[in-house]
UniProtKB/Swiss-Prot annotation:
List of catalytic residues: D89 (proton acceptor), D264 (nucleophile)
Keyword presence, Ligase: no
GO biological-process terms attached to the record: queuosine biosynthetic process; tRNA wobble guanine modification; tRNA-guanine transglycosylation
InterPro entries cross-referenced by the UniProt entry: ArchSynthase1/Queuine_TRR (IPR050076), TGT (IPR004803), TGT-like_sf (IPR036511), tRNA_ribo_trans-like (IPR002616)
Subunit and partners: Homodimer. Within each dimer, one monomer is responsible for RNA recognition and catalysis, while the other monomer binds to the replacement base PreQ1.
Gene3D superfamilies xref list: Queuine tRNA-ribosyltransferase-like
SUPFAM superfamilies: tRNA-guanine transglycosylase
Textual note on the cofactor: Binds 1 zinc ion per subunit.
EC number(s) recorded for this UniProt protein: 2.4.2.29
Requisite cofactors: Zn(2+)
Name this polypeptide is given: Queuine tRNA-ribosyltransferase
Binding-site positions, substrate: D89, S90, G91, G92, F93, D143, Q187, G214
Reaction catalyzed: 7-aminomethyl-7-carbaguanine + guanosine(34) in tRNA = 7-aminomethyl-7-carbaguanosine(34) in tRNA + guanine
Length: 377
């Protein structure tokens, strides 16, 4: 992987990630394909929304279908017929989400399979081996996602163990002679000094990119912004910056303003299946009866297949009848909305018009532009 940085405006960055399987323009949003599929979508449909890269889930793909079946197909690209870049998370967040059915030790994590209750052990070495079998273009280190809330002492112990796991991930990745990219994950909760210690340790180990983890786990939005403002300028400028698990459209805008290059989130797909649709004028809840006879598209400014061909009334009808097509059309729209937002942000950074773009974005939502510190380095 090669990262090229073209231009900046304030802390916002315009660049690209270059892989053997294709180029990813940044800032980029990655749709989530947890089980090797973006729910309800063919790879061709996902690509048509403008997506250059997908996120796959190491933990779930390890449990089903497993490494053996994956290797029989070649790798995850062949298994799901997506021949463009794939980033896989390490499984750390999914283990964190298991709660009481897992036990974390220095060696790794003991847990029971959420599928059949089988006892399973996952550690940094195994995570690297699984991601190697998946053929991931970007491999994430195995870490512990610091919960929120956590005391500073709890966050410190978690972060320091994640650093030790980062070294083990690096060592196993190198032993496997994996030719792809390996990203470190910055932890430390909402504590700036711990984030500093985490980043310093990761840079000393050396990675191809750096993710900001442990956010979007329940902390107040001002805390997320504060950590981004503190951490982003300290990440080596020649490495991509990835904010994990974020988020709403406004979170992407605010992340880009603070220097983030990559995002992922289940929100556009999950919300689509629940009838919550993102538009340039805010969220439309298609289940609302006001849309029953509305012949307008979801968003006049959207060029997606759904908006070009179907009315709000039709989408309301599909939802009321619980038709699968409704969820598919909604997903196409939401994913295209997110990609159009990223395209707009990239173009605005290129032309030095980011402030105007951000102002127009919030005006469309009927909101004031949030104040941010003078974000210059």
């Amino acid at each position: 992987m090669k990262f090229e940085l073209d231009t900046t405006q304030g802390r916002a960055r315009r660049g690209r990630l270059i892989f053997d399987r294709g180029t990813v323009e940044t800032p980029a949003f990655m749709p989530v394909g947890t089980y090797g599929t973006v729910k309800g979508m063919t790879p061709e449909e996902v690509r048509a929304t403008g997506a250059d890269i997908l996120l796959g889930n190491t933990f779930h793909l390890w449990l089903r279908p497993g490494e053996e079946i994956m290797r029989k197909h070649g790798d995850l690209h062949d298994f799901m017929n997506w021949q463009r870049p794939i980033l896989t998370d390490s499984g750390g967040f999914q283990v964190f989400s298991l709660g009481d059915i897992r036990k974390i030790t220095e060696e790794g994590v003991h847990f029971r399979s959420p599928i059949n209750g089988e006892k399973i052990f996952l550690d940094p070495e195994k995570s690297m081996q699984i991601q190697d079998s998946l053929g991931s273009d970007v491999v994430m280190i195995f870490d512990e996602c610091t919960p929120y809330p956590a005391t500073e002492d709890e966050a410190r112990k978690s972060m320091q163990m994640s650093l030790r796991w980062a070294q083990r991930s690096r060592d196993e990745f190198d032993r496997l002679e994996n030719p792809n990219a390996l990203f470190g994950i910055i932890q430390g909760g909402v504590y700036e000094d711990l984030r500093d210690e985490s980043l310093t340790g990761l840079v000393n180990i050396g990675f191809d990119g750096y993710a900001i983890g442990g956010l979007a786990v329940g902390e107040p939005k001002p805390d997320m912004h504060r950590i981004l403002e503190h951490v982003c300028p300290q990440i080596p400028a020649d490495k991509p910056r990835y904010l994990m698990g974020v988020g709403k459209p406004e979170d992407l805008v605010e992340g880009v303003r603070r220097g983030v290059d990559m995002f992922d989130c289940v929100m556009p797909t999950r919300n689509a299946r629940n009838g919550h649709l993102f538009t340039s004028e805010g969220v439309i809840k298609i289940r609302n009866a006001r849309h029953r006879d509305d012949t307008a598209p979801l968003d006049e400014k959207c060029d997606c297949y759904t908006c070009k061909n179907y009315s709000r009334a039709y989408l309301y009808h599909l939802d009321r009848c619980n038709e699968i097509l409704g969820a598919r059309l909604n997903t196409i729209h939401n994913l295209r909305y997110y990609q159009m937002l990223m395209e707009g942000l990239r173009g605005a950074i290129e032309t030095g018009t980011l402030d105007a773009f951000v102002s127009d974005f919030y005006t469309g939502l009927g909101r004031e532009v949030p104040e941010v510190p003078e974000l210059v380095d």
